[in-house]
Amino acid sequence: MDKTSLIGIILAFVALSVGMVLKGVSFSALANPAAILIIIAGTISAVVIAFPTKEIKKVPTLFRVLFKENKQLTIEELIPMFSEWAQLARREGLLALEASIEDVDDAFLKNGLSMAVDGQSAEFIRDIMTEEVEAMEDRHQAGAAIFTQAGTYAPTLGVLGAVIGLIAALSHMDNTDELGHAISAAFVATLLGIFTGYVLWHPFANKLKRKSKQEVKLREVMIEGVLSVLEGQAPKVIEQKLLMYLPAKDRLKFAEQGEAQNGEKKEEEA
C-alpha cells in the first residue's frame, strides 16, 4: 500500500477536526445531507458529463494506483542487469540473451530485448518503444485529468450550495435564531467543496502525475539500456550512461556499493 496517500488523508481529517474543535464548531454541523448531496453527487455528475464512459470506467483502477505501491524494477536494479547482458552479448552474441529474456517479468523490457535479439534495427526498436511510452503517458494524463477536473468542480459546487442555503435562510428573516442556524448550515457546502477539491481531488491528480513521470523515466532507462546492449557498448559505458538518470546523491551511493562489492570479490578471490 502507498502509505503516503493514506497518511495524508488521515492528517487532513485530523487537521479539520482539531480546527473545528479549536473554533468551537460542533461536528454535528457537518451532518448536512443537502450539502453532502450537492458536493458529492454534483461532482460525480459533472465528471461523468465531462468524460467519456471508457475513461470513467477506469476510475476504480485509478484509486488502486493511488493506494497501491508500484512493484517495479528500480533504476538501481536495472543498471547491473544491463551491464551483465552487455557483457554476455559482447562475449557470445545477442542470441545468447534469449535465455535471459525468459527471466524478465517486465513486459516492456522483455519486448525490447526480444526485438534486439530478433535482429531489429536500433531505430526501429527506439520508435516502437518510444511510441509505447507516449501512449502510456497519454493514458496516465487522461486519468489524472479526471481528478483535476473534480478538484475544479467541487469548490464551485460549494459556492452553489452556499447560495442555495442562503436562499433558504432568507425565509427565516423573522426568526433570528433560525436565521443564524440556516446561514451557518449554508456554508457547510462551501467547506465540503473546498476540502474535497483541494485536499482530495487535486492531490490525487498530482500523485497520479508523479507516478506517471516516475514510470516514464524508468521506461526511458530501459530504452537506453536495450539500445546500448544492441550497439555492443561496454558494460562500464552503459553503467555510466544509465547512472545519469539518478540524482547525484543516489549515483554516489550506487558507486560506493559497487566499490564495496568489488572489494568483497577481490577478498574472496584472494
UniProtKB/Swiss-Prot annotation:
Species in which this protein is naturally found: Bacillus subtilis (strain 168)
- What are the protein's UniProt keywords? Cell membrane, Chemotaxis, Flagellar rotation, Hydrogen ion transport, Ion transport, Membrane, Transmembrane, Transmembrane helix, Transport
Matching InterPro entries, A to Z? Answer: Flag_MotA_CS, MotA-like, MotA_ExbB_proton_chnl, MotA_N
Name the NCBIfam families for this protein. PRK08124.1 (NF005997)
On subunit structure and binding partners, the annotation says: Each stator complex is composed of 4 MotA and 2 MotB subunits. 2 A subunits and 1 B subunit are thought to form a single ion channel, so that each stator complex contains two channels.
GO annotation, cellular component aspect: plasma membrane
An annotated GO BP: proton transmembrane transport
Membership in a protein family: Belongs to the MotA family.
Supply the gene name.
Answer: motA
Q: Where in the cell is it found?
A: Cell membrane
Q: Provide the membrane topology annotation.
A: Multi-pass membrane protein
Q: Mind telling me what this protein is named?
A: Motility protein A
What the protein does?
MotA and MotB comprise the stator element of the flagellar motor complex. Required for rotation of the flagellar motor. Probable transmembrane proton channel.
A Pfam family that the UniProt record links to this protein = MotA_N
Show which residues sit on the Cytoplasmic side of the membrane.
Answer: 204-270
Looking at the UniProt entry, the stretches that span the membrane are 4-22, 36-53, 153-173, 182-203
